[in-house]
């Protein structure tokens, strides 16, 4: 055993945050969730902060954490989980493909406090809770529905001095059968959002009578791609948008949000 290289200016602050993800290693530092993969492959490049888009919120919760922080990487689900028991929060990082800035997509799970994790090949992903063993899967919280909420950071479209007049949102959503969602938008850092609901019909399987040997002939199935269009109003220099929905045993994945807007000037 010999020392081949050293990394200065950063350290792991939680032993159980270290996870190998194939060709990469993730760990929690006082600068965020760090990736070693880029440094291992090309030594001239620095460590990569894969939590940069949520770094401030993440490190604030880490600073208040008094209980042991646990983590796990699930190859089948392609996510890295980091649990913060004191704040009743689990950070979930999607490790499939980094964003253009090198960070991972991140979301939080609230209302659960996993005490342990186990990812069993060909059997599923499990979490140990104070109430028992929980298996991850499906689109219900046990037998109950749960809320999904996505909000962007304030958007200035490249120039804060120009007034934006939002006209229409074109969304691309996978799934959402028999679901009602709400589009939220607000101007100039307000938390009092304008809202417009939109919904999807239940997906039906196409059938043509009954097959000869007493079986049903199926011609379509699977998840549906929905492209709702929502008209919007108002104006401001900075825009925040969001989508909320109640997940009720059906997939709901926001793929794209296109914003149609006009610009103007302050007089």
Identify the function of each model-found stretch.
Residues 2-7:
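A short beta-strand motif characteristic of beta-propeller blades
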Residues 9-15, 19-24, 30-267:
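Beta-sheet repeat architectures centered on beta-propellers
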């Amino acid at each position: 055993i010999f020392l081949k290289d050293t990394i200065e200016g950063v350290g792991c602050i939680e032993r159980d945050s270290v996870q190998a993800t194939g060709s990469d290693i993730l760990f929690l530092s006082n600068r965020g969730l760090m990736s070693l993969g880029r440094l291992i492959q090309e030594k001239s490049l620095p460590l990569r902060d894969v939590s940069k888009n949520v770094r401030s919120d993440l490190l604030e919760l880490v600073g208040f954490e008094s209980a042991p922080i646990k983590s796990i990487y699930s190859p089948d689900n392609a996510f890295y989980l980091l649990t913060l028991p004191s704040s009743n929060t689990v950070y979930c990082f999607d490790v499939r493909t980094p964003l253009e800035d090198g960070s991972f997509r991140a979301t939080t799970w609230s209302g659960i406090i996993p005490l342990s994790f186990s990812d069993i090949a060909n059997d599923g992903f499990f979490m140990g809770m104070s109430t028992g063993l929980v298996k991850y899967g499906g689109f219900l919280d046990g037998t109950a529905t749960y809320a999904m909420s996505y909000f962007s950071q304030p958007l200035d479209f490249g120039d804060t001095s120009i007034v934006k007049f939002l006209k229409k949102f074109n969304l691309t959503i996978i799934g959402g059968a028999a679901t009602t969602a709400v589009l939220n938008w607000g101007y100039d850092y307000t938390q009092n959002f304008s809202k417009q609901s939109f919904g999807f019909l239940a997906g039906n399987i196409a059938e043509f009578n009954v097959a000869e040997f007493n079986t049903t002939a199926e011609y379509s199935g699977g998840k549906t791609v929905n492209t709702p269009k929502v008209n919007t109003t108002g104006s401001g220099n900075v825009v925040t948008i969001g989508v909320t929905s109640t997940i009720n045993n059906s997939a709901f994945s926001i793929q794209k949000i296109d914003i149609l807007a006009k610009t103007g000037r302050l007089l």
